[in-house]
Amino acid sequence: YGETAAVYVAVESR
């Protein structure tokens, strides 16, 4: 948990 969360937030933040 950490990298996946960062990537998920980055994609959802688009």
From Swiss-Prot:
Keywords: Cell membrane, Immunoglobulin domain, Membrane, Repeat, Secreted, Transmembrane
Protein's name in the database: Polymeric immunoglobulin receptor
Domain of life: Eukaryota
Source species: Capra hircus
Keyword Membrane: yes
Free-text description of this protein's post-translational modifications in UniProt: N-glycosylated. N-glycosylation is required for anchoring IgA molecules to mucus, but is not necessary for Ig binding.
Topology with respect to the bilayer: Single-pass type I membrane protein
Gene name tied to this protein: PIGR
Ranges where the Ig-like V-type domain occurs: 1-14
One Gene Ontology CC term in the entry: extracellular region
Quaternary context: Interacts (mainly via CDR1-like domain) with dimeric IgA. Interacts (mainly via CDR2-like domain) with pentameric IgM. Either free or part of the secretory IgA (sIgA) complex that consists of two, four or five IgA monomers, and two additional non-Ig polypeptides, namely the JCHAIN and the secretory component (the proteolytic product of PIGR). Free secretory component interacts with bacterial antigens toxA of C.difficile and eaeA of E.coli.
Main location: membrane
